[in-house]
Design a protein with these regions (language model features):
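Residue-level recognition of conserved beta-strand positions in structured domain cores
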Residues: 41, 54, 68, 76-78, ...
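Conserved GNAT-family N-acetyltransferase fold
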Residues: 42, 90
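A short beta-strand-loop-beta hairpin characteristic of the jelly-roll/cupin
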Residues: 49-52, 59-86, 96
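Short, charged/polar surface micro-motifs in flexible loops or helix N-caps
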Residues: 35-37, 45-50, 69-73, 118
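Short acidic/glycine-enriched loop/turn segments that link adjacent beta-strands
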Residues: 36, 59-61, 106-107
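A short, N-terminal "cap"/entry segment at the start of jelly-roll beta-barrel domains
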Residues: 1-38, 51, 121-142
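Ligand-binding loop in jelly-roll beta-barrel domains
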Residues: 73, 80-81, 85-86, 94-123
Length: 142
């Protein structure tokens, strides 16, 4: 199956090798800002998703996703997954276990904004299982 590559105003960036161990599939990262507030443009190849993870902070913190292209998923632990499209915004409070990534047959691009806080750190957890992930993509196809 041929997958259309989505183009946005930001460059795709290089292969996300620094975080590859926390992703299933291929992702790309273009750090747009490392000053004041870190902002990265993350591109997920079809079927790519990151592991469950938590953005910890003793005060403030969390993450904001600004979806810019393609089709993706966001899910918080214990909640149903949410389909994401260009223009969607996701506010992720500190301490919430979650994952995000592309649909099986679409590229997905978002800006990841790290919300400033005190005592911030990321905890990477288990991968989203293929079984869990494939159920979402079957629902989307219906």
């Amino acid at each position: 199956m041929k997958h259309e590559i989505i183009h946005t105003i930001f460059e795709r960036g290089g292969e996300n090798t620094a975080f590859a161990q926390y992703f299933v599939g291929q992702s790309y990262l273009n750090m747009l800002s490392t000053e004041q507030v870190p902002v990265g443009c993350v591109t997920f190849a079809p079927g790519c998703r990151n592991n469950w993870h938590i953005h910890h902070a003793s005060k403030g913190g969390g993450q904001i996703l600004l979806c810019t292209g393609g089709r993706g998923w966001y899910q918080e632990e214990g909640q149903p997954a949410r389909a994401l499209r260009a223009g969607d915004v996701v506010h992720i409070p500190a301490g919430v276990k979650h994952w995000h990534g592309a649909e099986a047959d679409s590229w997905f691009i978002h800006l990841a904004v790290e919300v400033p806080g005190e005592g911030t750190r990321n905890e990477w957890c288990e991968p989203v299982s293929d079984e869990e992930y494939s159920k979402l993509n079957l629902l989307e196809a219906l």
